[in-house]
Amino acid sequence: MISVFDMFKIGIGPSSSHTVGPMKAGKQFIDDLIERHLLEKTTHIQVDVYGSLSMTGFGHSTDIAIIMGLAGYLPHNVDIEAIPGFIAKVNKTAKLPLAEGKQVANFDPATDMIFHKTFLPLHENGMTITALADTAVLYKQTYYSIGGGFIVDEAHFNQQEEHPIEVPYPYANAADLLRHCQESGLSLSSLVMKNELALHSKVELENHLHQVWQTMKACIHRGLHTEGVLPGPLKVARRAATLYRMLKANNELSNDPMRVIDWINMFALAVNEENAAGGRVVTAPTNGACGIVPAVLAYYEKFVGALTNEIVERYLLTCSVIGSLYKMNASISGAEVGCQGEVGVACSMAAAGLSEILGGSPEQVCIAAEIAMEHNLGLTCDPVGGQVQVPCIERNAIASVKAINASRMALRRTTSPRVSLDKVIETMYETGKDMNAKYRETATGGLAIKVICS
C-alpha cells in the first residue's frame, strides 16, 4: 500500500523527480557503499544521467541534488542555505566529501557527471552512479526516479513488495475503496486512517500529518513575504507578495464576488515560487504540482471555516489515497505522462480532499476527483528553459481553482456520472503514453521552444 508517508514527503524544490529523487538516489548509493564496506576504498565517483532527467537536469538542479545525496544528505533535512557554498567548493577542488565527510573522493562535476541525450530502457528518468578505486569499479548501480520523489533501482523496477503488511481495507482501484466504504459505513478518510494505523502508530501518523500541513503553511508564509526574481535565465519575478499586499489593502472595501479566486491564486503562487527558488516544500504528489493541495486547504481556512486537526487529517488522508490510485494504476511523473500526471493528479487529489471535508459521500469524493482529472487530460509538460517556472507556477494556480470548482460540481450533482474515476485514471495513463516525448518534460517542444531565454 502507498502510505500518506510516501505521498506527502517534505523536501526541497524545484522538482520531486529531478531534485528530490536524484538526491535520494545519491544517498542510497552511499548507504549501499557503507553496507558493503566499500566507502573507505572509494577514491573516485562518476555519474551518468539519462533521458528527461538529463534534458531538463540543469534547470531542475539535478546535478546539485545528486552531489548533495552523495555527500550524505536527504531532501527533508539538508541545510538549504549551505548548498551553494558546498557546491562551489566541490567545483573548485574537484573533491567530493562522501557520507558527511567520512570519505573524500575525486569528483569533477564538469567531467565526472555526464548528461546523455539517450534514454535507459525502463523509465524516462534514469541515472547510473559508479564508485571506483583508482580505475577499478567497486560498485555500480542504476536508479530510476519515477515521479513524486519515488526512486527504484534497476533490480527492483516494477517488483512488488516481498512481504507487504496487511491492512484492513486493501484496494487496487477506486471501485474497491467505494465497496469498502459501502460495506463498512466508513467515510473515505476514516477508511484510509484505519489502513494507515496498520502501518504506523496513531502518534506517528498524527505527527506526520501535522508536520506536512505546518510545512505547507510555512511555505505559503515565506512565499507571501518574499519578493525579487526567481533563479535562472527566465528572470521570472515573484508575484505572490505583491498580490498579497493588494488583497490585504482592498479586501474590506471590495465587493467583487470573484476576489476569492485572487486569494486561491495567491496561495498557489506563493508555494510554487518557493519551490522554484529551491525552498522547503511538500511533494503533493510532486514538487511541480506542490501548490494545489495546500492552496485548496488554505482556501477552506480563509473562506469556509476554522481548521481543526481532524479536518486537516481528513483532507490530507483523502488527498493521499486518491494520489495513490494514480501512482498504482498510472503515473505521477511528468516525464512519463506529461503534466496531467502532476498538476492533473494534484487537482484531482485536492478536489477529493475538499469534497471530503465539506461532507461529501465517498461517491461524491470520487466524482470530484474524476471531474478534476477529466479536464486535465492531455496536459503537456513543456517547461521553458527546463525550469519549474513557466508554465508551472501559474498552472498550479489555475488548477487550484479548478479543483474547487470540481468539488462544487460533484457535491451539487443529482445524477450518476457516466465516467468513473478508475476509467479516467486509465485514460490519463494511455493518453500520456501516446504523448510525443517532446511534451513529456524534455523541453524539446511546446512552450519550451517558443519562449526564448535571454
Regions found by a protein language model. Give the residues of each.
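Accessory "access/gating" subregions that flank catalytic or transport cores
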Residues: 202-334, 338, 446-454
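C-terminal regulatory domains involved in ligand/effector binding and gene-expression control
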Residues: 75-253
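Hydrophobic alpha-helical bundle architecture
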Residues: 307, 318, 324-397, 409-418
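Short, mixed-charge aromatic SLiMs
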Residues: 44-57, 89-97, 243, 315-328, ...
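Alpha-helical support elements that line or immediately flank enzyme active sites
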Residues: 17-34, 294-306, 351-359
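Accessory carbohydrate-recognition regions in carbohydrate-active enzymes
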Residues: 12-55, 122
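Extended hydrophobic packing segments that form well-structured cores
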Residues: 418-454
